[in-house]
Swiss-Prot record:
Keyword ATP-binding attributed: yes
Name the record gives this protein: 5-formaminoimidazole-4-carboxamide-1-(beta)-D-ribofuranosyl 5'-monophosphate synthetase
Residues at which Mg(2+) binds: Q297, E310
Family: Belongs to the phosphohexose mutase family.
Described function: Catalyzes the ATP- and formate-dependent formylation of 5-aminoimidazole-4-carboxamide-1-beta-d-ribofuranosyl 5'-monophosphate (AICAR) to 5-formaminoimidazole-4-carboxamide-1-beta-d-ribofuranosyl 5'-monophosphate (FAICAR) in the absence of folates.
Pathway: Purine metabolism; IMP biosynthesis via de novo pathway; 5-formamido-1-(5-phospho-D-ribosyl)imidazole-4-carboxamide from 5-amino-1-(5-phospho-D-ribosyl)imidazole-4-carboxamide (formate route): step 1/1
UniProt binding sites for 5-amino-1-(5-phospho-beta-D-ribosyl)imidazole-4-carboxamide: H27, S94, N258
Biological classification of the source: Archaea, Methanobacteriati, Methanobacteriota, Methanomada group, Methanococci
Length: 361
């Protein structure tokens, strides 16, 4: 892990009046960049030329850093270009996937918003399960391997893959049949299979809850809630049951979009409770904890219990549903507030208070 002191040494050489907020052109970059501009920051996007159109059309980026391929992000010449523009990187799922988690931890020497040490706790299922479990959250039962399957389960794989390759099954035979099918289609590799995470299939309504922890205020804020459009499952459920049987198609759970929702108000104390518990435990297990945006993906069962099955330790894709604010985020200021602008507000306040070390790593 790059020492915090080294990152802050780099930042100390910056022109603090010309800080540029930078991210990769994908995932949640539109509201990250727009939010930064609304708070008076210069912005830049890292992109390939064929993916630059949205950032030009929407006018969210002041500068463009072009790469031949997104994996070039970690190259030293790109890092130097970022440092030269006094960059603060806001990481999201695509940035981590393209740069590579090992590079983010050990060789990407550009100041980054949030705690880069916690990103591995999202990527590795055992660490994620430890953090969720020790936080005291209700989580699905975990199975040690396919031979332990004794009822409906969901099979998942590590990393920010947007649900690709996930599948439900009920028996060990069904597990291996679906593994073989996905491997034949090139969706899964043998290495993926070795890292398969098998958990209890919880029946309930899905709520992806977006939080922001402010280290400057020491407060967890509820920013918004969304649900996902997933292919092919959301298409299959529109097909009558008898026709589904005839189609004989195994559903996939690839996230293709998101839509905003609100949760019943009587559940909000539970929503804040699980966010507070995760934030507190993260400070113990991976100091300084969950800084800035994070997400808890949950299912609400018919007992009105929130079961948390996954977390994001950085800005989650579902925050795109409230680029102009959510029913919750607007309650803090009385004005529309996106997650991107909330991040920029924290950076701006940290600079004003001389506490920028509290939000960077």
């Amino acid at each position: 892990m790059i020492p915090k002191e080294e990152i802050m040494g780099i930042f100390e050489k910056y022109n603090k009046d010309e800080v540029t907020i930078v991210t990769v052109g994908s995932h949640t970059s539109l509201h990250i960049l727009k939010g930064a501009k609304l708070e008076g920051f210069s912005t830049a996007v890292i992109t390939t030329k064929d993916r630059a159109i949205p950032y030009k059309r929407f006018g969210v980026a002041d500068k463009f850093i072009y790469v031949d391929q997104f994996s070039d992000i970690s190259k030293e010449e790109i890092q130097q270009q970022l440092r030269d523009m006094n960059a603060i990187i806001v990481p999201h799922g695509s940035f981590i996937a393209y740069c590579g988690l090992d590079n983010v931890e050990d060789s990407f020497k550009v100041p980054m918003f949030g705690n880069r040490a916690i990103l591995r706790w999202e990527a590795e299922r055992d660490l994620e399960g430890q953090l969720l479990g020790e936080s005291g959250l209700r989580i699905p039962k975990k199975y040690g391997g396919p031979d332990d399957i004794d009822g409906p389960v969901m099979v998942k794989f590590p990393g920010a893959r947007g649900g690709r390759g996930y599948f439900p099954c009920s028996t060990v035979e069904e597990f291996w049949r679906k593994i073989a099918e996905f491997k034949a289609k090139g969706i899964l590799t043998e290495d993926d299979v070795k890292k398969a995470h098998i958990e209890e299939y919880v029946v309930g309504a899905n709520y992806c809850i977006h939080y922001f922890y402010s280290p400057l205020k020491d407060q967890v804020e509820l920013m918004g809630i969304d649900r996902r459009y997933e292919s092919s499952i959301d298409g299959l459920v529109r097909v009558p049951a008898k026709d589904q049987l005839e189609l004989n198609v195994d559903p996939s759970y690839v996230i293709t979009g998101n839509f905003p929702v609100v949760i019943r108000e009587s559940l909000l104390p539970q929503v804040f409770d699980i966010g507070d518990k995760l934030s507190a435990k993260s400070k113990e297990l991976v100091k300084p904890g969950m800084l800035g945006p994070f997400c808890l993906q949950s299912l609400c069962n018919d007992n009105l219990e929130l079961v948390v099955f996954e977390m994001s330790a950085r800005v989650d894709g579902g925050t795109n549903t409230f680029m102009n604010g959510s029913p919750y985020s607007c309650l803090y200021t009385g004005e529309p507030l996106s997650m991107g602008q909330r991040i920029a507000k924290e950076i701006k306040l940290a600079l004003e208070l001389g506490m920028i070390d509290k939000v960077l790593s």
